[in-house]
From Swiss-Prot:
Catalytic activity: 5-hydroxyisourate + H2O = 5-hydroxy-2-oxo-4-ureido-2,5-dihydro-1H-imidazole-5-carboxylate + H(+)
Subunit description: Homotetramer.
EC numbers: 3.5.2.17
Organism taxonomic ancestry: Eukaryota, Metazoa, Ecdysozoa, Nematoda, Chromadorea
Function field: Catalyzes the hydrolysis of 5-hydroxyisourate (HIU) to 2-oxo-4-hydroxy-4-carboxy-5-ureidoimidazoline (OHCU).
Organism of provenance: Caenorhabditis elegans
A single GO BP: purine nucleobase metabolic process
Protein name: Probable 5-hydroxyisourate hydrolase ZK697.8
A single GO molecular function term of this UniProt record: hydroxyisourate hydrolase activity
Residues passing through the membrane, by range: none
Keyword flag Nucleotidyltransferase: no
InterPro entries, A to Z: Hydroxyisourate_hydrolase, Thyroxine_BS, Transthyretin/HIU_hydrolase, Transthyretin/HIU_hydrolase_d, Transthyretin/HIU_hydrolase_sf, Transthyretin_CS
């Protein structure tokens, strides 16, 4: 029985380690904070695009977790140098809270020149404004 429990503990640690390693260094993550309430904004859909041949190509769609984070917005896409766009769909978030908001969505367009780096794109949000920056 002790050997079996030890096996389960090692297996669980392996799964946790693999989950932590699943997100590559070359990736885009996001974080949404609702500054009007001072809390993370869970449940916001984030769409990811890359500009290819003068048009936007969808490379991923994720929802923020309860902590407001998306660890990897485009898990099925390998980063390449280029222009990217994240679209944070904010209207359903505020509608669910019965709060009027000015922006139905927020678009953030940015350049990736070094596709081997990690890019973190946080959004601080309120019903009447927003701000974004390159995080770490």
């Amino acid at each position: 029985m002790i050997k079996f429990l030890l096996f389960l503990a090692i297996a669980a640690a392996t799964v946790i380690s693999n989950a932590e390693l699943a997100v590559p260094t070359a990736s885009i993550s996001a974080h949404v904070l609702d500054i009007s309430g001072g809390s993370p904004a869970g449940g916001i859909q984030i769409l990811a695009f890359i500009l290819l041949n003068n048009g936007w190509t969808n490379i991923g769609s994720q929802f923020t977790q309860d902590n407001g984070r998306v660890d990897w917005v485009s898990p099925d896409f390998t980063l390449i140098p280029g222009t990217y766009r994240l679209v944070y769909i904010t209207e359903p978030y505020y509608t669910a809270k019965n709060v009027e908001s000015f922006y139905p969505y927020v678009e953030v367009v940015f350049n990736i020149r070094n596709a081997t780096q990690h890019y973190h794109v946080p959004l601080t949000l309120s019903p009447w404004g927003y701000s974004t920056y390159r995080g770490s």
